[in-house]
Amino acid sequence: MSSMQFGAATEFSNRCGVTLMNTPIGRVVAEVMGAKEGVELTEYPSMIRVDGVKLLSFDYDELTDALGQEFDGSIFEEISSTHYGRMVHLDDKTMLFASPEDAAEYIGFDLTAQ
């Protein structure tokens, strides 16, 4: 687990992340995400930060298997609080994008429109 740094930076970080409640469900979700390449976890007494490069994808089937009980968007909303990056909810997963342009196809935004 890494340490959190605070401050203001003007350059693009290419990172996105979410804060999860440090509960039994939140901990399992963090462990699944922490096993993925480019994902860092920072643990605090009441929360777990999940930070990644470019994209974080919380696949509900993968999380259901890890938990042994159904995981869906409503449970994601229940265990998460703050986030940074563009968040997109789909039926089978929640994704966070570091760049809004990368999320454009999921949110109906036409990058070529004048």
UniProtKB/Swiss-Prot annotation:
Gene3D superfamilies: Monooxygenase component MmoB/DmpM (3.90.56.10)
Signal peptide positions on this chain: none
Family matches, as Pfam families: MmoB_DmpM
Record InterPro entries: MOase_MmoB_DmpM (IPR003454), mOase_MmoB_DmpM_sf (IPR036889)
Induction (record text): By acetone. Transcriptionally activated by MimR.
A molecular-function term among this protein's GO annotations: monooxygenase activity
Function description: Effector component of the propane 2-monooxygenase multicomponent enzyme system which is involved in the degradation of propane via the O2-dependent hydroxylation of propane.
Quaternary structure and interacting proteins, as annotated: The propane 2-monooxygenase multicomponent enzyme system is composed of an electron transfer component and a monooxygenase component interacting with the effector protein MimD. The electron transfer component is composed of a reductase (MimB), and the monooxygenase component is formed by a large subunit (MimA) and a small subunit (MimC).
Family under the similarity heading: Belongs to the TmoD/XamoD family.
Name under which the protein is recorded: Propane 2-monooxygenase, effector component
Species assigned in the record: Mycolicibacterium goodii (Mycobacterium goodii)
Highest classification ranks of the organism: Bacteria, Bacillati, Actinomycetota, Actinomycetes, Mycobacteriales
